[in-house]
Design a protein with these regions (language model features):
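Short, conserved "active-site rim" segments that organize catalytic pockets and cofactor/ligand binding
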Residues: 166-200
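Acetyl-CoA-dependent GNAT
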Residues: 7-83, 88-90, 101-103, 107, ...
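Active-site acidic-Proline motif in GNAT/NAT acetyltransferases
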Residues: 88-94, 122-123
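C-terminal "cap" of GNAT-fold acetyltransferases
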Residues: 4, 114-134, 138-164
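Conserved G/P- and acidic residue-centered "switch" motifs that form tight phosphate/ATP-binding loops
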Residues: 64, 95, 112
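Short alpha-helical functional segments enriched in proximate histidine and acidic residues
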Residues: 107, 111, 180
């Protein structure tokens, strides 16, 4: 079943309440007190800075269930910020986060932004890997943060194309298959020999 994406506005009360829950889940998942980012005010005012015309708040449904959210909001002249990419734990592994991040990047480009900025934590290894595959590169801090080790990333939209991302994604699939193969050998060292026998 395909992922259904929506851009939320102020009248989407039910979906906005679900996004608020996603935001709370996101904060708990990070394990970081986000008060320094005015997190409570951000949730209460949704869509807030993520609203059109300069921002976008994406909401995804997968297999009939709310699954994911992400937002882009203006930061400075020609620059926007991608924030709050969150996928429900039992929905991960289906490529939903990648689809939503791509939707946000393409929206930013269509809105005329030259650059997308974002921050994350090195411990979020899968997310960091995704961002690098999408073309993000390490950048100087664009705001002060009390969270030690915060990783700041930037994406140059003027030199970005989705086709290059798709090519890079082949490496993502290789890494996934390699990890799966290693895991199967741990579970059953003779797994691939048995599989070869069945296919013979």
């Amino acid at each position: 079943m395909p992922v259904k994406l929506r851009i939320l506005g102020a009248d989407d009360h039910v979906e906005l309440e679900q996004v608020r829950q996603f935001f709370r889940n996101y904060a708990a998942w990070l394990g970081v007190d986000l008060d320094y980012q005015n997190f409570g005010e951000e949730m209460a005012s949704l869509p807030g800075a993520y609203a059109a015309p300069a921002g976008r708040l994406f909401f995804a449904v997968f297999e009939g269930r709310p699954a994911c959210c992400v937002g882009i909001r203006p930061s400075s002249d020609g620059v926007c910020e991608m924030k709050r990419l969150y996928v429900e734990p039992d929905m991960r592994g289906n490529g939903i986060g990648r689809q939503l991040a791509l939707a946000a990047i393409k929206a930013a480009k269509a809105l005329g932004y030259r650059k997308v900025m974002m921050d994350t934590l090195p411990a979020m290894r899968i997310a960091v890997k995704l961002y690098r595959e999408l073309g993000f590169k390490e950048a100087p801090a664009y705001y002060p943060t009390p969270v030690e080790g915060t990783l700041f990333l930037a994406l140059d939209l003027e030199n970005w194309s989705e086709s290059e991302v798709k090519n890079e994604n082949l490496f993502h699939l290789f890494d996934y298959n390699l990890a799966w193969a290693r895991r199967m050998r741990q579970v059953d060292p003779g797994y691939f020999e048995k599989l070869s026998t069945l296919q013979a």
